[in-house]
């Protein structure tokens, strides 16, 4: 057993020995199906903390000759598959975490040299009796091992794209790295499976097509591997039952990723943390700074800022993902920025409607954090002041609520959407902080000149009143209250039994002044 050649199954053992392990071993059914075929080169891209390394460790434990893993798979789904024994622990596996090598090298050139030397060392230690033609040529030496032993190789590369993320503008270094991977992987009879993971898909790095033999499965198209991207809704529901967590709140905070022919997919790390810690909160920011998001949404592309505002309010935005070049520096318009945000996990993609939206509350908080410290004028101010507006509603401070709505409305009034949507954006922006305490529902009666938003307290905040906020134009705040009462508090409140605050807000199109009336109802 070497360090990189046939590394064993210790890491997979740690995963299945954890308090929460969700069985994703059926992925091996797919890799066995494409083993030593024209589809044997597989690249899976997902955001950070979506289980890429756990999957790679599982494949190493399954295929590697350096360990005996049959008992580790006892009780797991793949054990029942007819192909399980055929491929178990029978291959030479090179497991490479590319980030590890890059971190220890000052340049990509030195990284490639180091990688060659270390893999060659492991190969010679494992096979000291092989007659190597050129001990400095890794690919040729692997061919020598295969010819003289008959044992094929499986190559597993984790963080394959780290060069493109850390050397974003160094095209020469990127092409040098791709040339290495091509020489290492392409058209090699002794490699029967190559499995790479990263955040970015492989293709379209300029005109360089060194790795065009890979089938790619990404956050835009995951194909038959969709259910392995994260936790499915069925898996999350089982965890909620075991840990006595509220499924509705878990869905609002960590759900939202959609793929063809697959049930909803949840952020796995956040679900695990929520279960283990018994707390539904933002775990995304424990692994990724909002400054990463801020870099991209601050780009000066026409329409990008408006798109972000609309998505913060819950809208779906059309997007063209076809022109994205799969790097982190080449952006021609807002479509390329939005496509990158899909791959980073900050947006989810609806392949049927060809549109994007913010997947859940956890990610929506990241946008709010990024916008609040950006130079977005009144938008940033409105987000920062949203907690004050929320407190003003709780305290029935009508003047302060009117002022907060007026600030937010100033920024959203230019959006070229129908009036009801523009009004809902205003409420969403002015009361953004309410999402920490409430589940939020929108009711937009088309053509009626007003928008309702209903805020129902989360289970952990039973002392908070429900809120119904209605914004109208050129009517009266009192009329807005009457409108709410006539609607019997909206459908969203039919099952709610606590206190309710009704906030009716009206504004004049002529002078832009806002008035507010708040009434308390004991239901």
Model-derived regions, located:
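Phosphate-binding site recognition
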Residues: 1-419, 434-437
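Active-site metal-binding core of divalent-cation-utilizing nuclease and nuclease-like domains
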Residues: 144-149, 435-462
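Structural motif
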Residues: 154, 465-467, 501
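Mg2+/Mn2+-dependent nuclease catalytic core
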Residues: 174-179, 473-490
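Conserved catalytic cores of phosphodiester-cleaving nucleases, focusing on short active-site segments
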Residues: 427, 451-455, 464-473, 487
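Short secondary-structure junctions
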Residues: 431-439, 495-497
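Domain-level recognition of nuclease-like catalytic cores that cleave nucleotide substrates
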Residues: 492, 498-523
């Amino acid at each position: 057993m070497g360090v990189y050649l046939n590394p064993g199954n210790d890491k997979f053992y740690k995963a299945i020995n954890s308090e929460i392990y969700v069985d994703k071993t059926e992925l091996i059914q797919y890799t066995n199906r494409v083993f030593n075929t024209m589809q044997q080169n597989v690249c899976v891209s997902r955001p950070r903390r979506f289980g890429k390394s756990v999957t790679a460790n599982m494949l190493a434990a399954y295929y590697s000759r350096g360990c005996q893993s049959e008992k580790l798979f006892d009780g797991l789904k793949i054990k029942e598959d007819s192909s399980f024994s055929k491929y178990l622990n029978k291959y030479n596996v090179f497991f490479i975490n590319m980030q590890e090598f890059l971190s220890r090298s000052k340049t990509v050139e030195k990284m490639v040299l180091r990688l060659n030397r270390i893999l060659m060392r492991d190969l010679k230690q494992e096979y000291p009796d092989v007659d190597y033609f050129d001990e400095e040529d890794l690919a040729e030496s692997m061919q020598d091992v295969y010819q003289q032993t008959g044992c094929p190789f499986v190559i597993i590369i984790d963080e394959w794209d780290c060069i493109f993320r850390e050397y974003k503008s160094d095209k020469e270094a990127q092409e040098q790295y791709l040339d290495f991977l091509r020489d290492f992987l392409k058209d090699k009879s002794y490699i029967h499976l190559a499995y790479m993971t990263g955040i970015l898909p492989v293709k379209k790095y300029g005109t360089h097509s060194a790795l065009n033999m890979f089938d790619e499965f990404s956050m835009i198209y995951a194909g038959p591997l969709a259910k392995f991207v994260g936790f499915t809704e069925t898996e999350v529901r089982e965890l909620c039952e075991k840990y006595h967590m509220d499924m509705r709140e878990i869905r609002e905070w960590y759900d939202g990723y959609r793929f063809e022919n697959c049930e909803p997919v949840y952020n796995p790390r956040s679900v695990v943390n929520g279960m283990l810690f018994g707390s539904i909160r933002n775990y995304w920011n424990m692994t990724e700074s909002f400054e990463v998001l801020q870099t991209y949404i601050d780009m000066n592309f026409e329409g990008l800022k408006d798109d972000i505002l609309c998505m913060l309010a819950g809208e779906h935005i059309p997007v063209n993902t076809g022109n994205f070049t799969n790097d982190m520096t080449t952006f021609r318009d807002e479509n390329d920025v939005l496509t990158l945000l899909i791959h980073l996990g900050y947006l989810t993609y609806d392949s049927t409607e060809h549109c994007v939206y913010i997947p859940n509350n956890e990610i929506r908080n990241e946008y709010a954090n990024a916008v609040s410290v950006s130079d977005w004028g009144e938008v940033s101010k409105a987000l920062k002041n949203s907690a004050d507006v929320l407190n003003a509603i709780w305290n029935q401070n009508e003047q302060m609520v009117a002022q907060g709505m007026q600030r937010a409305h100033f920024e959203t009034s230019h959006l070229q959407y129908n009036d009801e949507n523009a009004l809902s954006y205003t409420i969403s922006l002015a009361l953004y902080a309410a999402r920490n305490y409430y589940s939020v529902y929108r009711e937009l009666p088309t053509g009626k000149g007003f928008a309702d938003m209903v805020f129902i307290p989360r289970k952990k905040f039973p002392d908070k009143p429900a809120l119904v906020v209605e914004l109208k134009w050129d009517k009266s705040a009192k009329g807005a209250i009457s409108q709410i009462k006539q609607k019997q508090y909206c459908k969203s409140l039919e099952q709610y039994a606590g206190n309710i605050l009704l906030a009716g807000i009206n504004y004049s199109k002529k002078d832009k002044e806002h008035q507010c009336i708040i009434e308390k109802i004991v239901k």
